[in-house]
Design a protein with these regions (language model features):
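Ferredoxin-like alpha/beta domains used as RNA- or RNAP-binding modules
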Residues: 1-13, 20-21, 30-96
Length: 96
């Protein structure tokens, strides 16, 4: 897996992260936005773009991968495209 240290990377919209803490530990998310000490994420399934999850930077790990799907699709299609991108990423990681 392509894990990096969050302290060396500034998370931005479209980055893939994996949850390190909480009931969603091990889940893959896409970054929608960042706040002062928090990252706003969604997975398109349990946490949709309209019910975003707020996680501390220290509770996620950057996967060194990025998607432009957030900016390229209309807002009503974000969740379906996020699910598709996460599914594709999981398939790639399973092959490694």
């Amino acid at each position: 897996m392509h894990l990096t240290d969050n302290k060396k990377h500034t998370l931005k919209k479209g980055d893939f992260v994996i949850s390190l803490c909480g009931h969603d530990k091990g889940s893959i998310f896409v970054v929608l936005d960042t706040e002062q000490n928090y990252v706003i994420v969604c997975d398109g399934k349990n946490r949709k773009s309209d019910k975003r999850k707020r996680k501390k930077f220290s509770h996620v790990r950057f996967l060194n991968l990025h998607t432009d799907v957030i900016d390229k699709v209309p807002s009503y299609a974000v969740d379906a495209n996020v699910r598709r991108e996460i599914k594709r990423l999981k398939a790639e990681l399973a092959q490694e």
